[in-house]
């Protein structure tokens, strides 16, 4: 649906109309809609994973460029009710380098690899805040949509 539309704002507006949701009017409305949708989808996926595995997670690790968006990271923490650990930003390149280092014997194992990452790169933690009534309503509406 939103994978690669020709015109993303139009696709969002049409979906909002079709699902009887408020249609974004400004650039800020669209940005907020997208970020809230991402956070809600993270919550939905985490609920599914926890339901399938029976394992409860108290922390979500997010890597890559999206971690630079503090609003998205805090929103994710709030919506999921879980601590978000954000970073490192350049996770793909770092991972490739460290796997090569492991192959060359410079990194002993995955435990050592994770230790190198923790000591070498900045990460930021976001603690969940109580979800507002509007946030709870957004989760309810999100669940009502056809996933």
Where are these regions (language model features)?
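Glycine/Thr-rich phosphate-binding loops that ligate phosphate moieties of nucleotide
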Residues: 1-147
